[in-house]
């Protein structure tokens, strides 16, 4: 039997008296693009932080490709590439220097480091812009640079927290085209959070919809829409489950920073 890429069992975490994640059970299959959806404060980012070992689970159990997150944190980290909400690229460095920095942090062997940096930049379509200073990049290019930083260690699981928040539709599409191509070329598993239902419908194999710390709906976008009724969209499913609507924000690099700050505050 194939081991799940991610398995969460009765996963919970609280901040003071607030239960951010409340008994989450979840399995993600190797090679799939899995979307974790929900409004601000639903528990999405908290769940990702527990999977990535950045936050200990108060209760429950997590494995990544069969490796116990609580007992073998460093082994789990070697399996994961993570792009958080907060900007991780240094605007004073070139694209190549940014990715090389992450190669050193991930202990990519010195003998192959330059080649791995070139490979990661090529995967995200930045090979021709690699020697430009990152502060001159557009918002979409910054996001692709962050993807390269996460990919330089050849992870088996790529975790993306709101990867297109604050970008205009063209830049959003460009980022997703790269994510999709990377999954096709490498077989990598992708776990992503997003506020954009159209992205989840188009690019995710399955989605889980979180609200108040719990998973309220789980399945393929098509199945969830069919279950709701003829003509339904994933946004309709969201509104039924949460009684709310997602707000979007589009723009350049300043919008990216502002949107990420808001999402990080609200969870």
Please report, for each region that a protein language model flagged, where it lies by residue.
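Conserved ABC ATPase "signature" region
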Residues: 100, 104, 111-129
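Helical segment within the ABC ATPase nucleotide-binding domain
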Residues: 173-186
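Conserved catalytic motifs of ABC-family nucleotide-binding domains
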Residues: 154
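Catalytic Walker B motif of ABC-type/P-loop ATPase nucleotide-binding domains
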Residues: 158-162
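ABC ATPase "signature
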Residues: 218-219
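Conserved ABC ATPase signature
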Residues: 133-140
């Amino acid at each position: 039997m194939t081991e799940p890429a991610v398995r969460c069992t009765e996963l919970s975490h609280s901040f003071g008296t607030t239960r951010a994640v409340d008994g989450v059970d979840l399995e993600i299959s190797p090679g799939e693009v899995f979307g974790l959806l929900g409004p601000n404060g639903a528990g999405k980012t908290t769940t990702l932080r527990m999977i990535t070992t950045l936050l200990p689970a108060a209760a429950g159990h997590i494995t990544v490709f069969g490796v116990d997150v609580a007992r073998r944190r460093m082994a789990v980290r070697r399996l994961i590439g993570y792009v958080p909400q907060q900007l991780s690229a240094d605007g004073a460095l070139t694209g190549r220097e940014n990715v090389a920095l992450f190669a050193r942090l991930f202990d990519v062997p010195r003998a192959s480091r330059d080649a791995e940096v070139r490979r990661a930049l090529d995967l995200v379509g930045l090979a021709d812009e690699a020697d430009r200073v990152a502060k001159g990049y557009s918002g979409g290019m910054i996001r692709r640079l962050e993807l390269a930083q996460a990919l330089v260690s050849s992870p088996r699981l790529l975790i993306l927290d709101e990867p297109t928040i604050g970008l205009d539709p063209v830049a959003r599409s460009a980022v997703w085209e790269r994510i999709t191509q990377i999954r096709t070329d490498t077989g990598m598993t992708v776990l992503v959070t997003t506020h954009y239902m159209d992205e989840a419908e188009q690019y995710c194999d399955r989605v889980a919809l979180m609200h108040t710390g719990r998973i309220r709906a789980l399945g393929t976008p098509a199945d969830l829409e069919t279950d709701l009724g003829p003509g339904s969209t994933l946004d309709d499913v969201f509104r039924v489950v949460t009684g709310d609507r997602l707000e979007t924000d589009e723009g350049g690099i300043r919008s990216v920073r502002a949107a990420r700050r808001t999402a990080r505050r609200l969870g």
